[in-house]
């Protein structure tokens, strides 16, 4: 079926994988699709993680974020860089990327060349997205 027609009719919600199917397809022996997608982004764009200040994981619960953080540590991402606002405001889906970025810019003291990294896997369709943003102090 045409993807636009599938979307317009709402069929994309009917074909999502849930529970055990999701676990089977999300976790591979060599890492989760999240880990592999993030690694591909870091490698493709040669993202230097040395000044990583915040890593914003856009997933619906902290325990899922904690699971992928264990894998991410092998990429050189320190566990203490995880940034989340879920405990304060819950999870509202894709807009969390911008809500967290706004919170970082308003509430945190950033230093010259601090790196903010964000990544998400939309697990029911395995779409992935991310950004890397470097902060520069004004001169």
Where are these regions (language model features)?
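Conserved beta-strand-centric core segments of catalytic alpha/beta enzyme folds
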Residues: 1, 98-139
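N-terminal start-of-chain detector that recognizes signal peptides
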Residues: 26-29, 88-91, 104-106
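Hydrophobic pocket-lining "lid/loop/helix" segments that shape and contact the acyl-thioester
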Residues: 1-85, 137-139
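Cysteine-centered functional microenvironments
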Residues: 82-96, 119
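Well-ordered alpha-helical segments embedded in enzymatic catalytic cores
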Residues: 33, 37, 96, 100-103
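Gly/Ser/Thr-rich loops at beta-strand to alpha-helix junctions
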Residues: 58-63, 90, 94, 122-126
């Amino acid at each position: 079926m045409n993807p636009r027609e599938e979307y317009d009719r709402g069929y994309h919600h009917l074909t999502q994988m849930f529970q055990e199917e999701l676990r089977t397809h999300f976790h591979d022996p060599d890492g989760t699709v999240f880990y592999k997608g993030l690694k591909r982004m870091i490698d493709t764009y040669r993202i230097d993680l040395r000044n990583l200040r915040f890593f914003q994981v856009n997933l619906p619960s902290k325990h899922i974020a904690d699971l992928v953080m264990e894998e991410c540590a092998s990429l050189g991402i320190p566990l203490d860089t995880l940034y989340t606002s879920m405990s304060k405001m819950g999870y509202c889906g894709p807009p969390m990327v911008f809500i967290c970025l706004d919170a970082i810019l308003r509430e945190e003291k950033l230093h010259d060349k601090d790196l903010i990294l964000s990544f998400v896997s939309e697990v029911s369709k395995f779409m992935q997205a991310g950004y890397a943003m470097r902060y520069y102090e004004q001169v």
